[in-house]
Amino acid sequence: MTDVPVSHIRNFSIIAHIDHGKSTLADRLLQLTGTVDPREMKEQFLDNMELERERGITIKLQAARMTYTSRDGETYILNLIDTPGHVDFSYEVSRSLAACEGALLVVDASQGVEAQTLANVYLALEHNLEIIPVLNKIDLPGAEPDRVKAEIEEIIGLDCSQAVLASAKEGIGIEEILESIVHLVPPPRDTVDQPLRALIFDSYYDAYRGVIVYFRVMDGIVRRGDRIRLMASGKEYEIDELGVLAPNQKPVESLHAGEVGYLAAAIKAVGDARVGDTITLAHNPAKEPLPGYTEAKPMVFCGLFPTDADQFEDLREALEKLKLNDASLHYEPETSSAMGFGFRCGFLGLLHMEIIQERLEREYNLDLIITAPSVVYRVTTVKGEVLMIDNPSLLPEPQYREKIEEPYVQLEMITPETYVGTLMELAQSRRGIFKDMRYLTQGRTTLVYEMPLAEIVTDFFDEMKSRSRGYASMEYHLIGYRANDLVKLDILINNDPVDSLAAIVHRDKAYHVGRALVSKLKDLIPRHQFKIPIQAAIGSRVIASESIPALRKDVLAKCYGGDVTRKRKLLEKQKAGKKRMKAIGRVDVPQEAFMAVLRLKNE
């Protein structure tokens, strides 16, 4: 396998917005190069997680090695490193781009450039990749290749004279794409004689072999049986198995600079082989690790609690297993007076949170309660200490804090002109600060806003899609923290604060949110045998309250006529019982109530 000269290797990835046909295009490339046996071929071959196929999105990274004989008669090795297209996974995208020399920019010829495409293109340009524009879905009646070419040239500034017109579904233009990869993407640098440096761009956990690491050799050569060191963690391992991904694993003896492959070395947890880390040899280590390794920081936090307290250990195990595959998932145990024991989890964004939650419920059969997502606030205390708070119930009391700062993002929305008004209204209602508006070709507009992340985190994306009938797309990145007049809104049920319902909101919105919350909870919490007051409070001031009336048993059913004092005695007895119950009774808050809080924040 290693007799292929470096000049005949091409490493590329595919950049695209969700649903622009990236996975289908990857399928066609695998088919045309004969990489996958026609009998094994299925739609979206590389998306092999059930959830990915169902949602039609790529979540985990995949890689495949293809052999292609070009029209010039030479045989080339093409390594495709598939990238996820969603904004939450941009750290995965940046790693896989670092392992490539070129990228196919796939744009839907009927829709044009979308916000997410832009975000990934800028990442690719930062890594100095050769970008080949591909206009996909040209078989659609609504395709306008010339308009889209002009749009790519105008927005991204790429020369589109070389753009390939293709239809992955119909198999049109696939060979042209392969030819342009061979001729336009530069080969890797020939650095076989240097000390080994390889970039880890993905890893997953295999129950039998431990962690399987996907990597790209940047310098040097790696052989089976070598003792390797991971530069960020400093740990050492011996390689048991080394191979290439074609796309199924195929063992080989050695891999040299420029090649992409996998290794197994009895590594116990994915946390030991962090994505973006550098592999080097233990006896002849490289001086410097490869640049660009950062740990993905969670942006969104929420509490996960099992509905059945006995499942706590199962939940811990499930999270540990997911953590093996997903180094960006953070979790730590927490207790809540209303929900018992559970975990505080950190995610990259909302989609990431939904996927983890769905996988826990699906693959591990857990029944979960999820609290409202919150972002990380920066609180400066009176003493001048700076605290990072990811859980509203941990916020210090007002007299101890100097200021609260919240994360702000720059948000870019690309939308047809018709929906500009309604989207601007949406952004303003979410405390957005208008920054810029640019007109693109053919009646499309870019809107740029600065906005608190907390306002995007719940349902901004859904709201934007429904207001623009699905045509708008968005992309955001963090720009820093800013101080705001934020307060902690407590919800008291039966005079007890429920920590998992607490939220940090802007003072101007507090009354409105509190009012809406208590009335929603009134509808959702079932009636008990005693009266339940529900209150929303800021500090000690109650700003809204509702109460759920008690259920009453008809204690007078068996009194026909007779003395009124007899009836009064029974009613008094019932009243005393209710009073006692109220003092010691627990209110069961159903999962719907917590979910309502999620949805309500911005209604």
Swiss-Prot record:
Domain of life, per UniProt, equals Bacteria
Q: How does it sit in the membrane?
A: Peripheral membrane protein
What EC number(s) are associated with this protein in UniProt? 3.6.5.n1
Q: Which InterPro entries match?
A: EF-4, EFG_III/V, EFG_V-like, EFTu-like_2, G_TR_CS, GUFP, LepA_C_sf, LepA_CTD
Domain tr-type G residue range list: 7-189
Q: Quote the record's binding site residues for GTP.
A: 19-24, 136-139
* Keyword terms of this UniProt record: Cell inner membrane, Cell membrane, GTP-binding, Hydrolase, Membrane, Nucleotide-binding, Protein biosynthesis
- Annotated SUPFAM superfamilies: EF-G C-terminal domain-like, P-loop containing nucleoside triphosphate hydrolases
Enumerate the Gene Ontology biological process terms.
positive regulation of translation; translation
Coiled-coil-forming residues are none
Cellular component terms (Gene Ontology): plasma membrane
- Using the UniProt record, name the top-level EC class of this enzyme in a single word: hydrolase
Which NCBIfam families would you find in this protein's record?
lepA, small_GTP
Tell me the function of this protein. Required for accurate and efficient protein synthesis under certain stress conditions. May act as a fidelity factor of the translation reaction, by catalyzing a one-codon backward translocation of tRNAs on improperly translocated ribosomes. Back-translocation proceeds from a post-translocation (POST) complex to a pre-translocation (PRE) complex, thus giving elongation factor G a second chance to translocate the tRNAs correctly. Binds to ribosomes in a GTP-dependent manner.
Name of this chain's protein: Elongation factor 4
Task: State the species of origin.
Answer: Thermosynechococcus vestitus (strain NIES-2133 / IAM M-273 / BP-1)
State the taxonomy lineage.
Bacteria, Bacillati, Cyanobacteriota, Cyanophyceae, Acaryochloridales
